[in-house]
Amino acid sequence: MKKSNFSSIESIIKTVKKNGMFILVDDESKHEEMENEGDLVISTSAVNPNHINFMAKHARGLICLAMDNTQSKKIGLTLASPINQSRSKTAFTYSIEAKKGVTTGISAYDRARTIKVASNKNA
């Protein structure tokens, strides 16, 4: 049996339960809409400035917050582009920042704070 280079679902669930990060990859050869990339993922309940700093330093891409439609509507987010022409059709909203408890909005602390505030079901 060929050994996989990928973690099992069970292993990823254990990582999430331990407040850990994992890399979620897609495969362009399976779907033409895929970007053939990996994303660092962590639970919003676990994210802290150290995680944000790690993402910014090592992944060097956008730091995004995945959110369901109900929560995004609840906090008043709208799509950045109502007619999405991108290949992946990713539903990006405008950039956000917490109203309170942040300074410039760009620091790892401010970004982690914004994620915590935006993902709070009582927001």
Feature locations, PLM:
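Catalytic domains of riboflavin
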Residues: 1-123
